[in-house]
Design a protein with these regions (language model features):
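Iron-sulfur (Fe-S) cluster-binding segments and ferredoxin-like electron-carrier domains
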Residues: 328-332, 345-371
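Helix-rich terminal scaffold detector
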Residues: 1-30
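Short cysteine clusters
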Residues: 338, 343-346
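C-terminal accessory/binding modules appended to enzymatic or scaffolding proteins
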Residues: 301-335, 351
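FNR/FR-type flavoprotein reductase catalytic core
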Residues: 1-11, 126-308
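Ferredoxin-reductase
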Residues: 35-137, 156, 192-194, 221-223
Length: 371
């Protein structure tokens, strides 16, 4: 007996064939929707964005805002105020990437503003500030990062402690609140070394005068003789005076150099602010390993080691240099984002040897067990 005779003997088979024929003649063709979910996901979370420098704005003698738009004239992926993108560049023959917080508001979809300050020991920031020009093209990741303002869960009383270029995500949060007419109180406590280091100085001061629910407090730690503003570093006493009653009920954001972040966390702990009410930005270069309590003190930072990339080659570097930097300098690119270990995107398998992991890196139990 043939297969067709067997199928015809199955109850309901002919009815199904008839229904299939009717659907083919009268039904809707959904083939155009094939891959639509993937296309939507890519538009929201692209692996790479093709960007063009639309404008360059000088903020301070060492800081510029780079305005980046889509090369294709498209709206850029949405982001949350406080997040960053990873910018990919080739500098002095090294293909590398650096995370930069988005300074513009999430309500602005036509461009991303990245405010970049030249780092003392950095070479990417110097390239971007000194050599980048309007019309130049770049690639970036999509927006990412856990450091952001959540208007639903972070309450109505927000305090941002910023040091130096740590004001960049603060600006994005502030503009987002103001442009959406959200009435959360926003207090920016902004610390800089010198008067001409203050980024967005005129803009922030003007907004503080215009909006009653935005408070700006500035400190200069190395003032000139004729400086009239507040000077010195933050202390628990100063913070207590600025925050008033019930500091435990406020939501705190901290962004600045690593020592600044650590100091602010300690001050808030002294004021008994719960850890759950503190958000700290962790992207950027990790702090020196010998400043961390888990570092083996008898190992010198300039001690040389050999790194072997299985099947691809080997090179010599020093133990004090982040492994990601060493790999990139020798032509081995590893997908990365935060560069501090916080996001874990650069995770690779350790076959043999020993690698020091900074405190901010989030290793899973399986990472520790299997390398």
């Amino acid at each position: 007996m043939s297969d067709l005779h067997i199928l015809n003997a199955v109850t309901g088979y002919q009815e199904i064939i008839q229904a299939k024929s009717e659907l083919e003649q009268n039904g809707t063709d959904f083939s155009e929707y094939k891959g639509q979910v993937q296309r939507i996901m890519h538009s929201l979370h692209p692996k790479r964005i093709d960007l063009i420098v639309q404008a360059i704005i000088e903020e301070t003698p060492t800081t510029k805002t780079i305005r980046l738009a889509s090369q294709h004239g498209e709206a850029l992926p949405a982001f949350q105020a406080g997040q960053y993108i990873n910018l990919f560049v080739t500098v002095a023959g090294t293909y590398t990437a650096r995370p930069y917080a988005i300074a513009s508001s999430p309500t602005q979809a036509d461009y991303y503003d990245l405010t970049i300050k030249k780092a003392d020991a950095g070479f990417v920031s110097h390239y971007l500030v000194d050599q980048l020009s309007v019309g130049q093209t770049l690639q970036s990741s999509g927006p990412m990062g856990n450091f952001h303002h959540n208007p639903l869960f972070h309450g109505d009383d927000l305090v941002f402690l910023a040091g130096g270029s740590g004001s960049v995500p603060a600006r994005s949060m502030l503009l987002n609140l103001l442009e959406q007419n959200l009435q959360q109180r926003f207090h920016l406590i902004y610390v800089n070394s010198f008067e001409d280091d203050v980024i967005y100085a005129e803009e922030l001061r003007a907004l503080a005068k215009q909006y009653a629910h935005f408070t700006l407090t500035e400190y200069i730690t190395r003032p000139t003789a004729d400086y009239q503003g507040q000077t010195g570093r933050l202390s628990a006493e100063r913070l207590s005076e600025l925050l008033g009653t019930e500091p435990k009920q406020k939501m705190f954001y901290i962004c600045g150099p690593t020592p600044f972040n650590q100091s602010c966390q300690q001050l808030l702990a002294e004021l008994e602010v719960p850890a759950r009410r503190i958000r700290v930005e962790a992207n950027g270069a990790p702090k020196a390993p010998n400043t961390q309590s888990t570092w083996t003190s008898d190992i010198a930072l300039n001690q040389e080691v050999t790194v072997t990339v299985r099947g691809k080659g080997q090179f010599t570097t020093t133990v004090g240099e982040p492994l990601l930097n060493s790999l990139e300098r020798h032509g081995f690119f590893v997908e990365n984002a935060c560069r501090s270990g916080e996001c874990s995107l650069c995770r690779i398998k350790l076959i043999s040897g020993e690698v020091f992991t900074p405190d901010e890196a989030h290793l899973r139990r399986s990472d520790r067990q299997f390398g």
